[in-house]
């Protein structure tokens, strides 16, 4: 972290604004800073033990007004008016409801108009704002960094600490700049950008860092695209990801339920405009990517860094000289049941999943609908389209997108995390292969024995139509209707 009166990065500015008590000592022996938390997001999976800890200690929630809960990970995306069938999932959801009632926390339960994936409803409600600190017991809290917030996932013991004190002891992070300059080619999305970034720096490349995404290509993205970028910072090993707020940010936030109003809005925007990295500020690490060189990107392996352009082929481990890396590639190919040299476009899929906190927003659904309009999903492919929130679903319905999905043969579901992870009924069967707009392709992530290829919404939709990994450019035939 920069010292006082020196140029500072965006992350350093937000950090220093939230230090309650500075840690003593120097270097590795330095004690953590105590950081104030502006927004605490809660869901059913990582919170039960935290509330139990409060109960045992006789403590209240310090700031219930800065805490908001929703049900997302374990909820079904069909028959939401019926009891949850799985007993573990049902218990977690019921426990969250009891805890929120007991401790006075606002909850958006399954079926509520504001219910949805926690990282989608925060920005949707205007709760996520520039210059704030945001935490949640979930890895992909980094999503909120798209607004210039310092947002990070925390463990269950830390969830309890924030509930009890509204603070968190943290050691300062290193800083990394990922500069993406130039103009993105047609058909290249934010998802392709972040998959290319992770392939370049590796899944451990950002370890211990807060990544700030910069450059003209980043500035050209919508807020939804920026959220996709920041969402997957954790897949690069980073603690958080951030993008400096600008007019795009302000336009997205203006008028949302929890955004400042009137004179308060004007004052907030003036303050938010200062949330930029100072000229001359030093990053610990810098990465440069030419936007014009990017193309649709897909993963072939079992971690998000094992990816290539869609135009490439499955890598050959015999061409890798590092023994450890070669062994990892061989293991991934065996699990994925892929042969080296196979063109990525020739890989067939059994399922396509559109959704998650990475790509479950209205902009993503519009892209998918544009590809599916007048076309049909391949006969041997099952396609699930799952909105990230009930608000997103309602907007999609109002725009006629739901009709496009169902006419094409896709399943149009209710809001939830769905097939992103195997914690609810939406799962792959062993051996099934899925093109997924989610963020993780670990072994068994979408169900035991399932095989996952991470893709953008456009690639997901084209893949559903052709039955093999594809981009919309591969759909040469005109729509049939």
Curated annotation (Swiss-Prot):
Cofactor info, note text: Binds 1 [4Fe-4S] cluster per subunit.
Main enzyme class: lyase
The EC number(s) this enzyme carries: 4.2.1.33
GO BP: any one term: L-leucine biosynthetic process
Single GO molecular function: metal ion binding
This protein's record includes keyword Transit peptide: no
Family the UniProt entry places it in: Belongs to the aconitase/IPM isomerase family. LeuC type 1 subfamily.
Subunit structure comment from the entry: Heterodimer of LeuC and LeuD.
Annotated protein name in UniProt: 3-isopropylmalate dehydratase large subunit
Organism: Mycolicibacterium gilvum (strain PYR-GCK)
Gene: leuC
């Amino acid at each position: 972290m920069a010292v006082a009166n020196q140029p500072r990065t965006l992350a350093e500015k937000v950090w220093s604004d939230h230090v309650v008590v500075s840690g003593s000592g120097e270097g590795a022996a330095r004690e953590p800073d105590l950081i104030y938390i502006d927004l605490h997001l809660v869901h059913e999976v990582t919170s039960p033990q935290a509330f139990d800890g409060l109960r045992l200690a006789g403590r209240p929630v310090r700031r219930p007004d800065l805490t908001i809960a929703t049900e997302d990970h374990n909820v079904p995306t069909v028959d939401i008016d019926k009891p949850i069938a799985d007993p573990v999932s049902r218990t977690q959801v019921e426990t969250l409801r009891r805890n929120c009632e007991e401790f006075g926390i606002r909850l958006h339960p399954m079926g509520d108009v504001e219910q949805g994936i926690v990282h989608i409803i925060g920005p949707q409600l205007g709760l996520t704002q520039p210059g704030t600190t945001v935490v949640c017991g979930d890895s992909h809290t980094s999503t909120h960094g798209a607004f210039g917030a310092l947002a990070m996932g925390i463990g269950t013991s830390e969830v309890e600490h924030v509930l009890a004190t509204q603070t968190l002891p943290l050691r300062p992070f290193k800083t990394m700049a990922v500069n993406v300059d130039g103009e993105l080619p047609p058909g290249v999305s934010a998802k392709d950008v972040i998959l290319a970034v992770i392939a370049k720096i590796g899944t451990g490349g950002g370890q211990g860092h807060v990544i700030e995404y910069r450059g003209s290509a980043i500035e050209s993205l919508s807020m939804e695209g920026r959220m996709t970028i920041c969402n997957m910072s954790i897949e690069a090993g980073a603690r958080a990801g951030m993008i400096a707020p600008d007019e795009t940010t302000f336009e997205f936030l203006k008028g949302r339920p929890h955004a400042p109003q009137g004179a308060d809005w004007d004052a907030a925007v003036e303050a938010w405009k200062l949330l930029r990295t100072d000229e001359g500020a030093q990053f610990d690490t810098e990465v440069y990517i030419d936007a014009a060189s990017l193309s649709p990107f897909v993963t072939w392996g079992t971690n998000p860094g094992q990816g290539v352009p869609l135009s490439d082929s499955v890598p050959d481990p015999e061409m890798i000289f590092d023994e450890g890396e070669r062994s990892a590639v061989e293991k991934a190919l065996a699990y994925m049941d892929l042969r080296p040299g196979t063109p990525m476009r020739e890989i067939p899929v059994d399922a396509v999943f559109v959704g998650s906190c990475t790509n479950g927003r209205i902009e993503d659904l519009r892209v998918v609908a544009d590809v599916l309009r007048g076309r049909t999903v391949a006969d041997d492919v099952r396609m699930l389209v799952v909105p990230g929130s009930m608000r997103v679903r309602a907007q999609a319905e109002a725009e006629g997108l739901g009709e496009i999905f169902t006419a094409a043969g896709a399943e149009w579901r209710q809001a939830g995390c769905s097939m992103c992870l195997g914690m609810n009924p939406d799962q792959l069967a062993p051996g099934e292969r899925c093109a997924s707009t989610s963020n993780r392709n670990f072994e068994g992530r979408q169900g035991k024995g399932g095989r996952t290829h991470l893709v953008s919404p456009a690639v997901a939709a084209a893949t559903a139509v052709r039955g093999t990994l594809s981009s919309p450019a591969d759909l040469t035939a005109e729509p049939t209707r």
